Design a protein with these regions (language model features):
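Extracellular polysaccharide-targeting segments
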Residues: 292-338
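Extracellular beta-strand ligand-recognition surfaces/modules
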Residues: 224, 269-311
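Beta-strand-rich modules
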Residues: 390-394, 419-465
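Short carbohydrate-recognition loop motifs
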Residues: 169-204
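Extra-cytoplasmic beta-strand recognition segments
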Residues: 205-240, 270-274, 311
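Conserved aromatic anchor
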Residues: 330-333, 340-385
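Extracellular carbohydrate recognition and processing domains
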Residues: 249-282
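Substrate-binding cleft of secreted/luminal carbohydrate-active enzymes
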Residues: 3-168
Length: 465
């Protein structure tokens, strides 16, 4: 049954009143489906108001789908048709409350990748570096990914031990001013109350972020990239651990190994290898962070926040198969119009996977059944790409071009619906081109395991005007 968010002929008047129509459809109890029309209402009804930004849009969007952070939502009285009887409804309900939570596919079959981007933003980041900033913001549904299905409208925390102290307050938000890859990151703010308890010097909480479906007895690898933003009160120490817990409460996780890596710009990466040992076929799990705080002054409140820049889960490759290296094989440029004085055309490229050189071959006879390489890589072991960053760099003279680190980001794949192409227009380039000038275009991929290809695995093409 259809519900129009604009309220055209819909019971409840649309907008934040959509819940009134959906409550009659009752999809969870009656098994009926809901077709929701015009969800862009959250932007289109407010976009012309002074001071309206993508951050304010997200607050409005979050209220419609997940509910307010606190308090109630005041709604105008819904219009009624002539002769329509009054229909009394309870307080506001977010749209997500009418439908069961469905986790993403098993990351063993489809690797999970999230940079907590809703498909809009103000800037673009590559490995923590802002490579682009827009005056009016940008939109690209190809870059939309999970924003964490367990942190809205606010995270639900629990202690890691048996204590019964008051839990810290937690707030979630999207940060479009700082990110690791993409256009935004997930901001988590924690406020620990003052405590006189003897054990309050060390407090550890569990913060679930994303639900997943995992198959038992399979090996997975997960990594999270985060940045701590310290508060302004007093000194404290923090410890972070990436962890998983079953939603049912049965803790059957077997974490085989953990590692921590310091990245640039204040970012850090946590990586774990894990499996589930239960007898069931699969489990619905929550992936999140265990945050421990150590302070010498627990009798004073403590506030801090952290940014979650990226979350990835994928199959763990056996050591015997860690030999496939993804690369961009070639890049090409085709002009839109032949002999045009302006640069206008399409970049295309192709990807490949290479095997390393064989150091020792012990094939003793033509009948030897052991191959030099592993010749049966599965789909889950073959890397693929989420998107590609495109860079441009003008030649300094007829023969020379500067180092690749001087190249300027000009966009990504996907905005035109194509995974391995990019349209180039001279007026969109961030530098001036003169006749007979050459430009080098670089293609750099982001794999589905969250890794940006090093430049020696990327491709480029030179284009002359």
């Amino acid at each position: 049954m259809g519900v129009d968010v604009w309220g055209r002929g819909s019971h409840g008047g649309g907008g934040l009143g959509c819940y009134q129509a959906i409550s009659h459809i009752a999809p969870e109890s009656l098994g009926l489906s809901v077709a929701l029309f015009g969800q862009a209402w959250t932007w289109e009804t407010e976009q012309d108001k002074p001071g309206w930004t993508w951050d304010k849009w997200w607050e409005y969007e979050r209220t419609l789908w997940a509910g307010p952070i606190s308090g109630t939502v005041d709604l105008p009285e819904a219009p009624r048709r002539e002769g329509e009887p009054e229909c009394t409804h309870g307080p506001f309900l977010p749209l997500s409350s009418f439908f069961p939570r469905l986790s993403p596919p098993d990351p063993f079959n489809l690797p999970f990748h999230s940079t907590f981007c809703p498909g809009v933003g103000q800037s673009w980041f590559v490995e923590g570096i802002r490579v682009f900033e827009s005056r009016n913001g940008w939109t690209d549904v190809d870059k939309q990914c999970s924003v964490g299905d367990m942190v809205w409208p606010r995270p639900i925390l629990s202690w890691e031990d048996e204590r019964e102290d008051v839990l810290p307050d937690a707030l979630s938000a999207l940060c479009m001013d700082d990110a690791w890859n993409g256009g935004s990151s997930l901001s988590l703010s924690l406020s620990f109350p003052a405590s006189e308890e003897e054990t309050a010097a060390y407090r550890s909480v569990w913060i679930p972020i994303q639900s997943l479906t995992v198959t038992h007895q399979r090996l997975y690898e997960a990594q999270i990239i985060y940045k701590l933003q310290a508060g302004e009160n007093h000194e404290f120490d923090t410890e972070f651990a990436l962890a998983l817990k079953t939603v049912s409460g049965d803790n059957e996780t077997d974490i085989r190994s953990t590692s921590s890596t310091e990245l640039h710009g204040g970012w850090s990466k946590l990586k774990i290898e894990f499996t589930f040992t239960g007898t069931a076929t699969f489990s619905i799990v929550a992936m999140g962070l265990i945050v421990a705080v150590v302070t010498e002054n627990p009798d004073r409140p403590l506030d801090f926040s952290l940014l979650i820049g990226q979350l990835n889960v994928h199959p763990l490759l056996p050591d015997t198969h860690r030999e496939h290296d993804a690369l961009i094989l070639w890049a090409d440029f085709a002009p839109h119009v032949a002999s045009s004085p302006l640069l206008s055309g399409s970049l295309t490229w192709e990807v490949a996977t290479t095997f390393p050189r064989v150091s020792t071959i012990n094939i003793k006879s033509p009948e030897d059944p052991i191959p030099a390489w592993n010749l049966q890589p599965t789909i889950s072991w073959f890397p693929s790409f989420v998107y590609f960053n495109v860079y441009a760099q003008p030649y300094t003279d007829e023969w020379n071009v500067g180092p690749v680190t001087d190249a300027v980001w000009i966009g990504t794949s996907g905005i035109n619906g194509e995974g391995k192409s990019f349209n180039v227009l001279q007026e969109n380039l961030p530098f001036t081109l003169t006749p007979s000038k050459k430009v080098r275009f670089y293609i750099q991929g982001l794999t589905d395991q969250g890794d940006v290809l090093p430049w020696n695995r990327c491709a480029y093409v030179d284009v002359s005007l």
